[in-house]
Amino acid sequence: MRKLYYMGLEPYKARYTLQLQDWNETVFKQRKLDYVIVPGETLSNDQAIVTGQVLDAHGRTYFGMSQLMNLIKMMKAGELNSEDVIYFEDMFQPGIESLPYILKQIDPSHRPRIYVRCLAQSIDPDDFVHVWGMQDFMGHYEKMVDSFVDGVLATNEEMVMHMKIAGWKAPIYNISGLAFGKSEVQSRVANIKPFADRKYRVVFSARWDQEKQPDFYMDLIEAWHAQPGLEEVEFCVCSGSSLKSNNESYMKRTRELFLAGKLKIYENLEKNDYYNIVNDSRVVFNCALQDWVSNTVSEADSLGCNVLYPAYRSFPETFSNDPDRLYIPWSIEDAMDKLEALLDFPHPRMGEISDRNDSTIDRICDILEGKGEDMLRMTTDYRKHTRESKF
């Protein structure tokens, strides 16, 4: 690889995209890569996710298309050649259809290799594209991207399988993790608080949307309060904006639990605010139907907080099949038993999950440099890797 052209995501103060470029650049510099950050233009400076859930729909589209315009200027000027790589942080990149249109009509010596990272989309039955009825066009879009890229990066073995049954043909790699910068996250708190000094607090960090299954978390809260003799615990939900949901029934129940003093709401949090809450909590709890690896597990694990997630889809791989921090989906009894234990003592393997994800960008760079054969999943027996512990 002569030069890497990095197509990142618009930074939002309350989202992981704020740190994503910095995490990548730190690794690029450590590896002494020659790279270009392809800039995009923001539609608004208000940092608000007004339309949509993950990123603002108008803002994401505008930023992505402006990036493509800048990339195409570079291509027109002859700055890219066949030894270069364009890497997209998100397979969904508005304007990306312009690339095969151009590349098919120019000299092969100026055709860079192209890799995209898949975050979910229509291959995930619980992704928000299905909530909003976008699956038809998104499926066609994915097939279009699949037809011309040199590689698709999956975050785990289960996602690889979903890509396979969707009929994708491009080379698929399992990077087994999400891009993450452990030291950067830890630098955002004054110090890692000793576990024994932390509040008996359980944090829910996912969006309050149906694919994250907040009803199960609220079931757990009510079951905990109904069982005598258990530790008094603060159950909370953290949100980077005003708490909202794509299902109003959750908000009604949330208000009821809040008024009953059973659920605390922390909203409009910036990253440092959220990290300070996690740094003074004992468990981050997850019950998502749709969550591939999740940055929340790495953040909590970096900040000395226990993590409890369902043994579902990507999480057995993410947790290296740890039975103490994975509960039976969707067993309230098993979740409560394991939560009770994790509230009392730090897990002996705390820190290993975040260490693993801290090296994800290195694994991505290996693939981009043509050294990722061990992560390629194109043989008929590709499922053999599912049982393998990654750390």
Model-derived features: positions:
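N-terminal pre-catalytic "stem/leader" segment of glycosyltransferase-like enzymes
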Residues: 1-98
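Membrane-proximal helix-turn-helix segments that form the acceptor-binding/catalytic region
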Residues: 131-152
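Donor nucleotide-sugar binding/catalytic pocket of nucleotide-sugar-dependent glycosyltransferases
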Residues: 147-191, 196-197
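Conserved donor-binding/catalytic core segment of Leloir-type glycosyltransferases
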Residues: 191-223, 235-236
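Glycosyltransferase donor-sugar binding loop
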Residues: 232-251, 267
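Nucleotide-activated donor-binding/catalytic signature segment of Leloir-type glycosyltransferases, i.e.
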Residues: 248-272
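Aromatic "clamp/platform" in nucleotide-sugar-dependent glycosyltransferases that forms part
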Residues: 288-290
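A charged, aromatic-enriched C-terminal amphipathic alpha-helix characteristic of glycosyltransferases
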Residues: 330-333, 337-391
